[in-house]
Structure formats: C-alpha cells, structure tokens
C-alpha cells in the first residue's frame, strides 16, 4: 500500500513537469499513466518475487526471456532490493485482467490468473527496448522501464489464430514459435487444423494407417509430397508449452467432409468402399464419411477419445464445412438412415451426423465447435458456431441462442492478398489489407442486445494451399495479427493512425525476434510491362508510408529520372515516402520499401519506349484461331519449340471444357489475330501460360501457379488486327489445376472501368 501511495504522489508531482507519454504497446491497454522522468533499472539487485506455486512457470519463462538479451540472471526469491512481484489477485473479475505497477525500485504485476500475470509481463516487455526480443546478449543497451501504472482487461474471451499443416506441412518448431508470438499480443487460442483431404497429421494409435498413408500424396506429374505428422507426445508437449503462455490449443478433426486422407487409409468408412487416394489438388472433395454406417461413428469416437486424451481444451472443433451430399444421395446406407430417422434431405442428414458426433464429445466431457454449415441441418443449443461465410452464420447462431466465434472470410482469412496481386506472392483471391483488419467490428448490428454476449470473440485463419513453408506463413500472419489482437482485446480504443505509429516499434521487435513479417510493397504501376511513346509518369507509394528506393538507375540518361529534388537511387542513399518518377527511355524499374534496415521484396516493371502504337496488320475477314495440342505433362514451356503436336485444328475462340481431366495433361498453342476497335493503350491480362501480341511476349506465367490474373501488360495498339499467340497448359501446378480457370484473355482501355473477355467475334485468321 505504501508503494502504491508513493507512486500516486510521484505521478501527481510529475504532471506539473512533463506531459504523460504514450507507450508503444499492442494491443492498446484499457487505461495507463506513464512518465519517463523516473525509471526502474534492471540490474544485479533485481529479482522476481513469486510466492504462488501456479505462477512459477510464468516466472521462470520471464527470467529466461530477460536473460537471453540482457545477460541478467534474475533470481526467483522471496524478497530482494528491487523486486518484480508476480501475484494472482482473486478479486479481479476477469481471469485475464492485469494491473502493472512500475516504480523506481519495484515492479508489481497483479493478474486475475496466471494468464493475467503473463499478459501483464508481455506489456512490461513491450515497454522495454525492442532488442529485448533478441536471442543473444545485446551490450550497451539501457534496460529500464518508465514509472507507470497500467490497468487492462480483454473485450473478448476467445482471441484465436488458426493454422493449417495439412496442405503444406508446418513443423512443430514453427507452431511453437507462433504460440510465442501470438501470446505476446494477448491472443489466447490456437486452432490447430489437424486433418483434411490432403493430409492427416494427428497420430491415432488405434488406426496407424491414418499417418502411414494419410501423410503423403502422389502428384499428377508422379512426384510424391511427403508431409509429416505430430505424435501424441509432441502435441502434449505443445499443450503444456502453450499453457504457460496463456494459449489453449483447440484441435480440429474434419468430418464428415474433408476426409479423403482418412478414407484413403480406411476405405470401409466411405460410402463406396473405395479405393480412395489422398487428394492431390485443393478444393472440395465429393467423398464423405458414410452417415449410414454405424461403424463410422465408432471410428470417430475412437479418434476423439485419443484426441481428448492429448488436448484438455474445453472445445473440440469437428469441422462440418463444405460437404456436397451427392454421394449420400446415391448411397443405400445413407438413404436407409434418412428413412429410419425421418429425414427428408441430405442436409438434414448432415445435421444428424453433426449432432451424433456432438453426443460423443459430451460423453467425453467436451463441447463442440463447427463451421457455420452445421447450422444448415439443425444444431443443438450447446453447439458453438464458427462463422466463416460472412457474418450471417454468427448472426443466426447468436440470435437463436448459440455461442459463436466470428471469422468472416473477407476480414479474417489471412491467406488473402495484403497488397497488390500484381506483385505480392500468390494468395487466395480476396484482398485483406492491414487497415481493413483493424477496422473490423466483430459483433454485427443485426445481433439483438440480449444476445450480443453470445459472440465469444474472433479468429484469424491461415489456410496453407498457397503457403509453401513456415517463413511464408509468418509473412501472411504479421502484422495483420497485431491489428486483430487490438480489435479483440481493446475494450473501447480504436485509432488506426496511432496503431501505425506503435506498429513501427513493434515491427522492430519482430525484426529482433526473427519474425518474417510483411513489409508493404511499392504500389502504383498497373502492369508489369508498360509501353509508352514520349515519356511516362510513375508515382510510387506504399500503405504504411515507409521509405522507398528504386535501384540501379537515377538519371534521365539511364532512362529514369526524379520529378522532385532529393529522390534518387539506392546508391545515392536517399529515400522517399512517395516517389514521383519520369521514364523517358526503355528501362527496367526496380523498387522496394525499406524499414529498420530491412527491405521488402522488389517489384519490377519493364517500361518499353516505342516510336508509335503497334501498326495493324492487313484486313482479315475470317473469324477463328489455329489450335495445336500436344499430350503429356509440361512443367513449363521451355521445350515447346521441339514438341510434335498431336492435334491441329481451327476453333472459334479459346476452348474450355470443364470435363477435361488434369490427370491426362496436355498443352495447347493458339495462333491468329485479335481485332481492336480504336487506337489506344490497352491493358491486357490472362492466366494462360504465355501470351504474345505482335510477336512480343507480354505475359509469361511459364512454370508458375496461374490464377487471379496477376500478370498484366499495357500496350499501345493501332485500330485493326494484331497477331496473337496464346499457350494454355492443362496441368496441375502445386495443387491447382489450370482448368479451374477458363482460358480467357481480358482486355480494356485505360479509360474503361472493367475488363471484357475476348470471344469468338474478336479473333481472326
């Protein structure tokens, strides 16, 4: 009490001397006062005072983290001269709430539970220099804290992050690292997606084939993807590791759909009896666990029994999403089940399946979470709904009395683009910038006042179809997870400009901790290939206003010049938060963003100076294109000049047949002319392998994953006919079949708002 009174008196006196400063903490605390004129210094007189047994793991972790970068070995003692006191305060109404007092000669962290104390220590760590996150000792650093009082508690009890090790396997070391970092920002649930069509990653001792067969898949080109799995002992270790950091692991076993890896191992649990193969492509599989086979539910119970022995979490996630029911419609056992249970549709059969699985979980002492499709066939009041197809599932669930967790795909799917798809790595097709995440409100207005407390919180999801490794996973998670952490934790504070300022310091922490976070890329160019006649103005900016450079060229003689004094190339050592450039000769412009000594990926745009718009060819009157097809698997177009074509014919346009099978791959070359109606600059895009116009290869997707029209070209074309060559490669590239996207060429003038697809009337021969 004397210490608290002294603190109050010091703050009152200092208010006359200095304005209170902010703290660069994410998420923003509920309430705090800070003054830097007096400080607590870590030294040999510092120690950790921890008298409650349940806090000992938290204290030991804090001591370990402090030692790595400071070299100080803080003892855990009953008393010392400069104590850091950790204490659980049972009077706090929220178990995750904390109060942090920092004096010149003591620190006190009071939490509603061990998790609350841990969160208080994370705020303390963020008040130290960013170098506190380094793994090696940093000499010459001022390891001190400003005197402060911080009072804080969470808005939502469920603050989740989802990871998917089933499309591309993520090693346990990566998952542990994410537990470390998400907990630093007070996220408290790790949703671990353990099974899917493409891989089974949970060891089930009663069914060893699940991991013997379900962890590898044979690709169309004959290569084998060998993933991995987690042993039960490894996962028990992960659970304990996360518990100390205030994180609960919520495991997910997908059913009745997304189960091809399981059916490949145990085909007797499918409607047809197999044979099945682990799915080699992404997307939705039509085969499901058989709802009419009682042995399936014993299979599920056996798996869930072993799962719950590993994971002590209150909730178990059972999936339930994306279940096309055609296979059930054709299955005699499923139809018999429907008749027996008085069910009229397969959607109701899906509801029966989910409710029966929930009964198994209740017998095991657990509660069920499912994706929002579980609402469609009827769900019990005790089920918790994870709303991913927008807000509607969460609204319906909450208003009918079910608990819900909000994770709408347009705001919470971190596998979506966070910058321009022209230059960012391949991602799912949505666009989710940092500011959109920060601006999200998790409780929709359509939820009635009496049901608003049914929203437990929210969650970020990272599906790994286009996440090849752990490094890229971090690139997609951070810093968007920091924005979400503030949305889910901060009670009544939201200021994006202030968040961006705090983010600068936190990004330095990520750098020190070896986290591969996303830096924004320069934006402004509309294409990777741009034609011009005299000169072209280029304005580059980025979403966080960080410095940018353009490499290798800096004068008009070299092709690119600055439009304002003081903006130059990297060699000149000058950067700008907005670059205004003038391109006067053909040149390859490379530019990037830099922050804290770290550079973003480099974007490249080729500016091609032409004397005049490409002249049109002679008048043509016959529609159509010449097509050649060669059968076989072509990883890229390198060998195309030496191919003997199997088919040569005449077609009206680019041909698309959804029934084409990627299991019998082939490559096609279309040649002819395209007609444009006026002389103009035309923006052209396609997901084809290659596109040539007037003998210039303007788009090259050879050997790349092709979707989302990420390659564009801006050409100057004269009114009339222009030669065209298009290459379409019907193969699977990293799980994505080319024929999931129509072989289209899209075009528009600079003035037009929307692209149009070139069709039969546009092509000539």
Locate predicted features:
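Active-site neighborhood of glycoside hydrolase catalytic domains
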Residues: 277-280, 284-381, 388-396
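Acidic, contiguous N-terminal accessory segments
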Residues: 20-157, 367-371, 375, 379, ...
């Amino acid at each position: 009490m004397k210490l608290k009174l002294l603190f109050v008196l010091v703050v009152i006196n200092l208010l006359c001397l200095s304005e209170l400063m902010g703290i660069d903490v994410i998420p923003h605390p509920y309430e705090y006062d800070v003054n830097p004129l007096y400080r607590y210094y870590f030294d040999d007189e510092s120690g950790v005072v921890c008298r409650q047994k349940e806090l000992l793991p938290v204290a030991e972790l804090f001591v370990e983290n402090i030692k790595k970068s400071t070299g100080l070995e803080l003892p855990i003692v009953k008393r010392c001269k400069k104590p850091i006191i950790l204490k659980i305060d049972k009077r706090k109404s929220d178990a995750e709430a904390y109060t942090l007092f920092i004096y010149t000669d003591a620190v006190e962290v009071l939490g509603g539970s061990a998790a609350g104390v841990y969160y208080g220590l994370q705020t303390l760590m963020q008040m130290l220099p960013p170098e506190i996150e380094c793994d090696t000792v940093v000499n010459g650093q001022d390891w001190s804290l400003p005197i402060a009082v911080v009072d804080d508690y969470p808005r939502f009890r469920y603050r989740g992050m989802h990871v998917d090790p089933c499309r591309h396997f993520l090693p346990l070391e990566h998952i542990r690292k994410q537990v470390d970092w998400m907990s630093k920002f007070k996220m408290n649930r790790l949703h671990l997606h353990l099974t899917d069509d493409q891989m089974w990653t949970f060891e089930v001792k009663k069914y060893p084939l699940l991991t013997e067969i379900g962890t590898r898949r044979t690709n169309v080109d004959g290569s084998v993807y060998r993933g991995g799995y987690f042993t039960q002992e490894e996962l028990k270790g992960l659970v304990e590791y996360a518990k100390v950091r205030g994180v609960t692991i919520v495991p997910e076993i997908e059913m009745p759909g997304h189960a091809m890896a399981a059916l490949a191992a145990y085909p007797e649990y499918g409607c047809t009896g197999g044979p099945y193969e682990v799915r080699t492509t992404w997307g939705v599989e039509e085969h499901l666990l058989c709802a009419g086979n009682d042995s399936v539910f014993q299979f599920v119970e056996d798996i869930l029994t072993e799962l719950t022995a590993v994971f002590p979490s209150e909730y178990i996630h059972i999936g339930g999403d994306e279940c096309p029911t055609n296979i059930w419609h054709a299955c005699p056992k499923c139809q018999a089940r429907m008749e027996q249970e008085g069910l009229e549709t397969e959607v109701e059969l899906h509801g029966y399946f989910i409710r029966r699985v929930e009964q198994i979980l209740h017998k095991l002492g657990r509660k069920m979470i499912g994706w929002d499709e579980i609402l469609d066939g009827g769900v019990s009041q005790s089920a918790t709904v994870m709303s991913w197809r927008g807000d509607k599932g969460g609204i319906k669930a909450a208003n009918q009395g079910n608990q819900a967790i909000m994770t709408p795909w347009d705001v919470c799917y971190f596998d979506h683009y966070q910058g321009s798809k022209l230059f960012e790595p391949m991602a799912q097709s949505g666009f989710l910038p940092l500011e959109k995440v920060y601006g999200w409100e998790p409780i929709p207005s359509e939820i009635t006042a009496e049901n608003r407390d049914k929203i437990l919180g929210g969650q970020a999801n990272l599906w790994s179809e286009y996440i090849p490794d752990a490094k890229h996973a971090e690139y997609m998670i951070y810093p968007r997870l920091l924005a979400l952490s503030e949305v889910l934790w901060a009670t009544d504070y939201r200021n994006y400009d202030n968040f961006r300022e705090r983010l600068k310091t936190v990004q330095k922490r990520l750098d020190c901790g070896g986290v591969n976070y996303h830096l924004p890329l320069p934006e402004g160019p509309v294409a990777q290939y741009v034609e011009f006649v005299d000169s072209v103005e280029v304005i580059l900016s980025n979403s966080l206003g960080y410095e940018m450079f353009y490499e290798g060229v800096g004068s008009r003689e070299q092709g690119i010049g600055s439009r304002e004094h003081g903006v130059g190339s990297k060699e000149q050592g000058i950067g700008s938060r907005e670059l205004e450039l003038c391109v006067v000769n053909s040149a390859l412009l490379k530019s990037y963003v830099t922050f804290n000594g770290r550079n973003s990926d480099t974007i490249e745009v080729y500016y091609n100076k032409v004397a005049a718009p490409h002249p049109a060819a002679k008048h043509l009157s016959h529609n159509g294109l010449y097509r050649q097809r060669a059968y076989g698997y072509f990883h890229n177009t390198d060998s195309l000049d030496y191919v003997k074509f199997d088919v040569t014919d005449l077609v009206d346009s680019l041909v698309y047949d959804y029934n084409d099978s990627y299991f019998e791959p082939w490559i096609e070359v279309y040649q002819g002319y395209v007609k444009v109606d006026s002389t103009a600059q035309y923006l052209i895009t396609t997901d084809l392998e290659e596109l040539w116009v007037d003998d210039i290869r303007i788009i090259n997707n050879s050997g790349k994953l092709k979707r989302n029209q990420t390659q564009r070209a801006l050409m100057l074309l004269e009114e009339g006919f222009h030669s065209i060559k298009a290459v379409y490669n019907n193969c699977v590239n990293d799980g994505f079949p080319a024929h999931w996207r129509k072989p289209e060429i899209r075009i528009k003038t600079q003035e037009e708002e929307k692209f149009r697809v070139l069709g039969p009337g546009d092509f000539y021969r």
